[in-house]
Amino acid sequence: MTEEHRLISAESVTEGHPDKVCDQISDAILDDLLAQDSSSHVAVETSAATGVFLVFGEVTSEGYCDVQSKVRETLRNIGYTSSEVGLDADSCGVVVAITEQSAEINQGVARLTDDQETAASREERYEAQGAGDQGVMFGYATDETPTLMPLPIYLAHRLAFRLTEVRKSGEVPHLRPDGKTQVTIEYDDDDKPVRLDTVLISTQHDPEVTQDWLAVELKKHVIDPVLDEVLGSKVPHDNYRQLVNPTGSFILGGPAADAGLTGRKIIVDTYGGAAHHGGGAFSGKDPSKVDRSAAYATRWVAKNIVAAGLAHKVEIQIAYAIGVADPVSVNVETFGTEQGVTRGQIAAAVRKVFDLRPAAIIDELDLKRPIYLKTAAYGHFGRTDVEFPWEKTDKVEELKAAIAAE
């Protein structure tokens, strides 16, 4: 590796990781409530320890969620069905401490009644719904992968997803739900990925498994297929370091081995460290919370900019004040990669094309639907196994037209 080259790493985790278990429980509850009442206001957190889960937070909804049943259903779907794997969905403890949303918060994002919705114009409605909290959010896109995601996090997610696939299908026997992946990519001085350096997989397994057998099986059924799919002939990967369970056996996993908590994998959820993060987590929050909806919107904006060929990579920063509809600020950073336009022109086009008020985001991306459980593992962005509305590139022509009109 030359002095100008850099090594960049990113990690992912499987759905059986204790923090991801908590994310999925929180989003399963959110989806259940949104399916009954699309205007539900939800902020639900989950914590996990050995054999017990605490579900807590605030909810205002016309719907009802049987939280205990939803927790157990989620755990069964992940694969925690026996004390042998460290957790039995049917016998674990579930403690629920959910209250109503604060009236002081609710007044800033109060739900519009049917009468108000009918009488008010869309513009009035957009002005009426302020942000659910203050905060700063970021969105990012880069043209180094077809999904416009950074290669390290995209590859790490694909490995984690495949690891779960072979576990659930039985293609690789003796695997258990908990697992992590990490990849390291070498970049040249033009910031282009030029070589795969390292692949790391740590996976929970049955006691009878040997480490040599596991390394061979994971290379054959997980690593090689994913590398061929993602890297192909574009990025050399014929001489990389493979690490499988480098500490040795990994029999005890999940919440039996480590406590879990909603919102503790925010870099895994987003861009693997390639972009800034405002600090707000996603799971368990309805779209009135800009931590979630604005992060999705900024990804949508960034992806359309790159898809339009205006820049090779872009980061969008947005900030809000609680109870105020219009963003406090919107910043566009192209890292000097803009193509035939200035950064100022791109920023002006963004302001013209995208309405980033919370209610407008919710409408444009159709966010008041039960679509969130699938986001809670393997990343919220750049997915190929499921379609999310913030991944659409439907504003490309409008952005080009806005640039041309300046």
UniProtKB/Swiss-Prot annotation:
Cofactor(s) annotated in UniProt: Mg(2+); K(+)
Assembly notes: Homotetramer; dimer of dimers.
Gene3D superfamilies according to UniProt: 3.30.300.10
Protein name: S-adenosylmethionine synthase
Binding locations of L-methionine: 58, 101, 258, 289
GO molecular function term, any single one: magnesium ion binding
Biological processes annotated in GO: one-carbon metabolic process; S-adenosylmethionine biosynthetic process
Reactions performed catalytically: L-methionine + ATP + H2O = S-adenosyl-L-methionine + phosphate + diphosphate
UniProt-listed HAMAP family: S_AdoMet_synth1
Family annotation (Pfam families): S-AdoMet_synt_C (PF02773), S-AdoMet_synt_M (PF02772), S-AdoMet_synt_N (PF00438)
The encoding gene: metK
Subcellular location: Cytoplasm
Keywords recorded for this protein, A-Z: ATP-binding, Cytoplasm, Magnesium, Metal-binding, Nucleotide-binding, One-carbon metabolism, Potassium, Transferase
Similarity-based family: Belongs to the AdoMet synthase family.
InterPro entries, A to Z: ADOMET_SYNTHASE_CS, S-AdoMet_synt_C, S-AdoMet_synt_central, S-AdoMet_synt_N, S-AdoMet_synthetase, S-AdoMet_synthetase_sfam
Cofactor: binding details: Binds 2 divalent ions per subunit.
